[in-house]
């Protein structure tokens, strides 16, 4: 909604028979400032979200669930950029609505549709991370679950945006300069405006906020609980084998790192949504229910809210650059990847073998009288466990290393 044009148009009530016609709203310094801010937000949002979409489409193979969600979020943010920000720029430049009644209804519908979609995709990101952390064993169900959430986000956005097309219409008033057209709401009573404002507040902010905050509180609780269990669980020296180290700790550790990394990114996206939109909805509440009459304040905070579509691609880009930089730093420290072998005996003694995969050289630290069972590679938790080359895993009955291979 263009609150500046709308309020100026609405507040100029007059008696035609007793007072002269007022001046029509005109382009002034307020509009200049608004155009500069909105223009900057639009350019950054357009190029940022376009690059995110291109980057995700260039990914080979199947996309992960978080990548599918980020793709849809970028599409939703592009819709906000065009149907909210760009339309507001054009409308501010012309001051008057010049596109007719049909376009008034269509554009108002698309304006709210983009906001709903961006909000519900952000909620889906929070839910996806919540399922990933709370129920890691259901990874196979994640793609279907995400497709359902994305579909629901699009369908609900389309349904909840319908009232906007019904409420808004082109209206005309006579000013001294002539007939003035504006696209604005057509409530017949104050309670209608308050009812629609309350429903918009609940559907676009309150319910999504509750879901997102609850999801990340559950994530935080689970991570803290898991960390305590990991540090507090003692390792049994009589039953631990290389196989249990590999598939019980190493593999879980790698998956946990991947989940936590994507959870951090999605947490920042959710935090940006809350920080950008909370001030606007507080002002919106006073504007709708307490008859605050400061349209310019609403404009400032609505611009802050729509700038969320500019921040999301910057957040995704920052995490992508950090991931690449971290990967290159790791490669610089170990160009070919260091292969760490862990060999554990039933007495709890261990030996480690560090092998450089490029040169094939390696070094082993052995303990005299040690019983070697199996070894595993930390660099590939999916690799089958097998004895280390050059070290016989057969033990003598007394548990000591044989001096030569048997038979």
UniProtKB/Swiss-Prot annotation:
It comes from the Eukaryota. Belongs to the G-protein coupled receptor 1 family. The keyword Glycoprotein applies. Signal peptide: none annotated. Keywords: Cell membrane, Disulfide bond, G-protein coupled receptor, Glycoprotein, Membrane, Receptor, Transducer, Transmembrane, Transmembrane helix. Glycans are attached at residues 5, 11, 15. It comes from Octopus vulgaris (Common octopus). This is Gonadotropin-releasing hormone receptor.
């Amino acid at each position: 909604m263009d609150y500046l044009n709308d309020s100026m148009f609405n507040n100029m009530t007059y008696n035609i028979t007793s007072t002269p016609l007022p001046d029509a709203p005109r382009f002034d310094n307020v509009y200049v400032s608004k155009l500069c801010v909105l223009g900057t937000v639009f350019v950054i949002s357009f190029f940022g979200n376009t690059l995110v979409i291109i980057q995700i489409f260039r990914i080979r193979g199947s996309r992960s669930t978080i990548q599918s969600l980020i793709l849809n979020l970028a599409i939703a943010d592009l819709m906000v950029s065009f149907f909210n920000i760009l339309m507001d720029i054009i409308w501010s430049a012309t001051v008057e609505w010049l596109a007719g009644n049909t376009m008034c209804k269509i554009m108002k519908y698309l304006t709210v549709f983009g906001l709903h979609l961006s909000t519900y995709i952000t909620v889906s990101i929070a839910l996806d991370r919540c399922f990933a952390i709370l129920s890691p064993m259901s990874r196979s169900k994640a793609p279907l679950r995400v497709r359902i959430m994305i579909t629901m986000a699009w369908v609900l956005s389309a349904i909840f945006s319908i009232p906007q097309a019904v409420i808004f219409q082109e209206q005309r008033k006579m000013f001294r300069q002539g007939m003035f057209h504006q696209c604005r709401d057509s409530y017949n009573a104050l309670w209608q405006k308050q009812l629609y404002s309350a429903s918009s507040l609940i559907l676009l902010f309150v319910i999504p906020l509750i879901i997102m905050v609850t999801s990340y509180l559950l994530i935080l609780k689970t991570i803290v609980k898991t960390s305590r269990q990991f540090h507090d669980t003692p390792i049994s020296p009589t039953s631990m084998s290389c196989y249990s180290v590999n598939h019980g700790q190493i593999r879980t550790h790698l998956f946990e790192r991947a989940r936590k990394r994507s959870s951090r990114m999605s947490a920042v996206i959710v935090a940006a949504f809350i920080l950008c939109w909370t001030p606007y909805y507080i002002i919106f509440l006073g504007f709708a229910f307490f008859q605050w009459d400061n349209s310019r304040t609403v404009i400032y905070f609505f611009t802050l809210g729509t700038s969320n579509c500019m921040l999301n691609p910057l957040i995704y880009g920052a995490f992508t650059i950090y991931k690449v930089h971290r990967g290159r730093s790791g490669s610089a420290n170990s160009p070919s990847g260091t292969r760490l072998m862990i060999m554990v005996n039933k007495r709890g003694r261990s030996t480690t073998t560090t092998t450089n995969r490029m040169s094939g050289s390696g070094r082993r630290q052995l303990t005299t009288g040690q019983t070697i069972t199996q070894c595993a590679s930390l660099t590939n938790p999916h690799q089958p466990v097998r004895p280390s080359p050059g070290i016989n895993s057969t033990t003598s009955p007394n548990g000591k290393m044989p001096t030569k291979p048997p038979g």
